[in-house]
Amino acid sequence: MSDGSERSEQLARYVAALRNSPHNLLSPKGLAELESRHIPESLQFAASLPGPGRVLDVGSGGGLPGFVVALARPDLEVHLVEATGKKAAFLDEVADSLGVRVVVHHARAEELAASDLAGTFDVVTARAVAPLDRLAPWCAPFLTSSGTIHAIK
């Protein structure tokens, strides 16, 4: 981001898009905690990441934390994986309207694992996607040899 005010404006527009979406991108509780919990946690996660690098958010849903990481950290190349068409379309539309540089993959992680994305990410994250014993095999194929998985509950 070029400056803090631009980031704040983009975050506000992103939050408004989440709140106004007809697609139930977040649960009622998630919407209630969006600005008090989910956005701050995503920003904190973004700040903790080394850079430059590549980040993959598996099961992006409404874009937490991946979309917020892309907003906060333009030095990172962020990819979002979302299997549900309406959610992937939302992420594409919001990225275009806000000018945020992300790549949205409308697919299941298991399907993409055999693609040219395998072994190319420094960080793979997933928030409330599945238990760790199921999640790790979905995420591991995307990691570089020194990459890490960040599973967020």
Per-segment meaning from a language model:
Residues 13-18, 63-64, 107, 134-137:
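Short hydrophobic/aromatic-rich motifs at helix boundaries and adjacent loops
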